[in-house]
């Protein structure tokens, strides 16, 4: 009986909802963004950059991004809410900013709060983005990830193919980025990874 109650509690904890981001979400989104960057990029990006990140500045940036996405059919911002914890992740997608790429869609961001990672929320968010891009007629999608970002292996688990590398300069630090691509978004959804349920 105790085990049954424990299982029910665990199942209830995973009840989630994915929806478009709205202006009243900006504080939660900004907090997730700052906390995730500080957790993920410690030792990768300069400490000064991470220390000086502020929720207030990110709120302004995300408010602008949500306004833009609301009036721009090609760009979407999604949040994921957990029943009790509230908003625990944010993601965005749209057209591939590299117009010469054979992948027409791009995942711009996918952040799950550090306290809620490794619980399947990233899979649900990625699936939600793929569904949007399928609806918009994109033939595939890419995401660029810092090579030293430990979360990049998530995209390999999600069947993303390593399709490119580049070097960028961020805050005076040269970093290497890796591109992961999915050439068949419908196939990626049907394969069971990523999946919504």
Model-identified regions with their sequence ranges:
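Acetyl-CoA-dependent GNAT
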Residues: 20-24, 34-44, 49-115, 126-128, ...
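Amphipathic alpha-helical recognition patches that constitute DNA-binding helices
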Residues: 28, 106, 140, 150
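Hydrophobic "lid"/C-terminal helical patch
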Residues: 29, 33
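Residues at secondary-structure transition points
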Residues: 49, 53, 75, 102, ...
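Conserved glycine-rich acetyl-CoA-binding loop
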Residues: 100, 109-127, 134-136, 146-153, ...
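Conserved catalytic-core motifs of GNAT/GCN5-like acyltransferases
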Residues: 142-146, 156, 161-179
């Amino acid at each position: 009986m105790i085990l049954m109650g424990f299982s029910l509690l665990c199942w209830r904890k995973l009840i989630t909802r994915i929806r478009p981001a709205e202006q009243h979400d900006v504080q939660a989104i900004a907090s997730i963004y700052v906390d995730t960057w500080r957790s993920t990029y410690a030792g990768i990006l300069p400490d000064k950059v991470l220390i000086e990140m502020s929720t207030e500045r990110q709120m302004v940036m995300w408010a602008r991004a949500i306004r833009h996405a609301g009036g721009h059919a090609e760009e979407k911002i999604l949040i994921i809410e957990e029943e009790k914890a509230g908003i625990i992740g944010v993601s965005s997608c749209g057209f591939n900013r590299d117009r010469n790429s054979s992948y027409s869609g791009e995942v711009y961001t996918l952040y799950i709060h550090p306290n809620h990672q490794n619980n399947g929320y990233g899979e649900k968010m990625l699936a939600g983005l793929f569904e949007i891009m399928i609806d918009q007629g994109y033939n595939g999608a890419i995401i660029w990830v810092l090579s030293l970002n430990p979360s990049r292996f998530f995209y390999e688990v999600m069947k993303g193919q390593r399709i490119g590398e580049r070097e960028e300069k961020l805050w005076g630090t040269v970093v290497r980025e890796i591109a992961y691509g999915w050439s068949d978004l419908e196939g990626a959804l049907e394969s069971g990874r990523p999946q919504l349920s």
